[in-house]
Amino acid sequence: MSVLRGVGLGRRYGSGQTAVEALAGVDVEVRAGRLTVVRGPSGSGKTTLLNLLGGLDRPTSGRVLLGDDVLSELSEAELAAARRDRIGYVFQNFGLIPVLSAAENVEVPLRLRRMERGQRDERVAEVLELVGLTRHAGQRPGELSGGQQQRVGVARALVARPEVLIADEPTGQLDSETAERIMDLILEVTRIRGTATVVATHDPLLISRADEVLELRDGRVVAGNLA
């Protein structure tokens, strides 16, 4: 079942002779319980595409559909609610708040939803167990390894039980063994929870395990098996 779709997506920055076309005419479909990988060289438009799909940016042309909602037509408040409640993000640089513990970082999306304390505690404990960090719940990011920090990032992305998981180079700063653990975790969540997952990556192992692969070059699709 299609959960997230991009139809004819284009993104242009600037205007006139200095305009840069970062993305042009891209179609993509992300399905429940399946992993879609976006690959391509640096500067090919991978991050731009993920930003559009995740509602972090608006397309210059085309549409992004999350279920029946057209993200690019939502108000800022509606778009913020969709990002908060329906989409989880995993970033290459982890994006953790240094002064908060692992558990507190994971809890942030639930606080934004004004969820009751008891329910927040249950959700946080559940996802920390899922990523194998229960014993490290009280530690701050600076006390954790890179792999542990990325697992906190994954837990934070999952704690609100999103329909869509978007990950931009989630293994880019990790050693091969740790990267494989993160890949296994992302795949487990995709399969067991039925999450629609889209990942931008150069990692050949993760690419080989994808259900669908979309290859970008200079902002355009040059190959893919997204039929």
Residue ranges and their predicted role:
Residues 1-2, 226-227:
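Short, low-complexity, intrinsically disordered N-terminal peptides in bacterial proteins
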Residues 3-209, 213-216:
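ABC family nucleotide-binding domain
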Residues 213-226:
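H-loop (His-switch) and adjacent beta-strand-loop-beta switch element
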